[in-house]
Amino acid sequence: MSNNIYKIVSLYSFFSFQENSIIELKENLFSIEKNNDLSGLLIIAREGLNGTVCAEEGIIENILKLIKNIVGNNKLNIKVSYSKKKIFKKLKIKIKDEIVTMGVPEINPSEDSGTYIDSFSWNKLIKDKNTIVVDTRNHYEVSIGSFKKSINPNTENFSEFPEWVDDNLGKYIGDDDSKNIAMFCTGGIRCEKATSLLKKKGYKNIFHLQGGILKYLEDMSKEESLFEGECFVFDKRVALDHELKQGSYSICHACGMPISIEDQKNKEYREGIQCHFCVNKFSDNDRKRFEERQKQINKLKDKNQKVYKD
């Protein structure tokens, strides 16, 4: 399918996912993969499903029918993009306790969460002086692009977000209950779960960007957009520009940080071995392993074989 275009669908839904339905969906998807060029990553839990699938148009439509039959009347949030290359090596399906790990079992986003704000209303909301804007993503995602004047909790992973809320959010709210709290993330799932957490803690006037940054970039013209930079994604594309095309960043295969073209010109950068983010992070033995891995990758590249870091 090298001459075809891959359709990429990122999706999630919070709903009560029964165990028999989880097993059935997993079996059906792997059955489709056997005979088709399907790749992706899906995370399934009792609270719903979350992930991205990549295939040709017809296969994607069949997968969406399967998922919609299970989700039922619950809202299935979908973002679509396209690529000339596969963005995953294969199909992976993981069954976990949460579809996005926060570590607060007492919240239930399918029953109680904040108010959706569409892309066109979002600009007005975040321009309001009575609104604080919180980026619920990890620090390395925020580092390559975010909305103007948004708060960066500087978390390593989403499970650190509840602690940040307890320690810091009150400083921005003060005693003013009229403050709006507007939250966003890549595709909508983390900020939706974050609003459920805040409601559980008694906060009011809580909003989240429907469909996340990806939907916003799809809806808004570059001239109207308040998003600056590129949007980090968890696949081989690394980042997307405002046209939802592959951006200018790559990944340091030593530490996993996104690195720009300028970063690669840094004297500390060695492809596959280190970047300026991790130059003091690993041991000499680690670097020897990374160097050997990179040599093998380069050899295979020379033979015109595609090699992906899993």
Curated annotation (Swiss-Prot):
Gene3D superfamilies: 3.30.70.100, Rhodanese-like domain. Its EC number is 1.14.-.-. GO terms for biological process: tRNA modification. It catalyses: uridine(34) in tRNA + AH2 + O2 = 5-hydroxyuridine(34) in tRNA + A + H2O. Coiled coil: none annotated. The active site is at C185 (cysteine persulfide intermediate). It is an enzyme of class 1 (oxidoreductase). GO terms for molecular function: oxidoreductase activity, acting on paired donors, with incorporation or reduction of molecular oxygen. Residues 127-225 form the Rhodanese domain. PROSITE patterns: RHODANESE_3 (PS50206). Keywords: Oxidoreductase, tRNA processing. HAMAP family: TrhO. Belongs to the TrhO family. Catalyzes oxygen-dependent 5-hydroxyuridine (ho5U) modification at position 34 in tRNAs. This is tRNA uridine(34) hydroxylase. It comes from Prochlorococcus marinus subsp. pastoris (strain CCMP1986 / NIES-2087 / MED4). The lineage of its organism: Bacteria, Bacillati, Cyanobacteriota, Cyanophyceae, Synechococcales. The gene is trhO.
